[in-house]
Amino acid sequence: MYAVFQSGGKQHRVAEGHTVRLEKLEVATGSTVEFDQVLLIADGETVHVGAPLVAGGKVVAEVVSHGRGEKVTIVKFRRRKHHDKKMGHRQWFTEVKITAINA
């Protein structure tokens, strides 16, 4: 059984027991989170596709940790002008473990 749900403007395909990194959620570590924006649920031969969401569909997850991703370096450069600018960015994330998928 797997599901596709939406969180933080992105879509994630998950199954029970999977660990997923999402955009940062303001939730304490160890707590339970429910995602109700479920776009698709597949259970063996049966596939429920939402229009746009599956009615009654829910993905339940447990918050494992919070952290920051790898550093991305941004470089701005203007040729022949002796101008260059270098910046970095590390995006916050929340790691969750999928515990249940309800149709």
Swiss-Prot record:
Q: What are the record's GO terms for cellular component?
A: cytoplasm; ribonucleoprotein complex; ribosome
Molecular function, one GO term: structural constituent of ribosome
Q: Does the keyword Ribonucleoprotein apply?
A: yes
Q: Which GO terms describe its biological process?
A: translation
Key words, A-Z: Ribonucleoprotein, Ribosomal protein, RNA-binding, rRNA-binding
Q: Which residues form a coiled coil?
A: none
PROSITE patterns (UniProt xref)? RIBOSOMAL_L21 (PS01169)
Classification via Pfam families? Ribosomal_L21p
**What is its quaternary makeup?**
Part of the 50S ribosomal subunit. Contacts protein L20.
Spell out the family assignment given in the record's similarity comment.
Belongs to the bacterial ribosomal protein bL21 family.
Function of this protein?
This protein binds to 23S rRNA in the presence of protein L20.
Q: What name appears for this protein in its UniProt entry? A: Large ribosomal subunit protein bL21
Lineage here is: Bacteria, Pseudomonadati, Pseudomonadota, Gammaproteobacteria, Alteromonadales
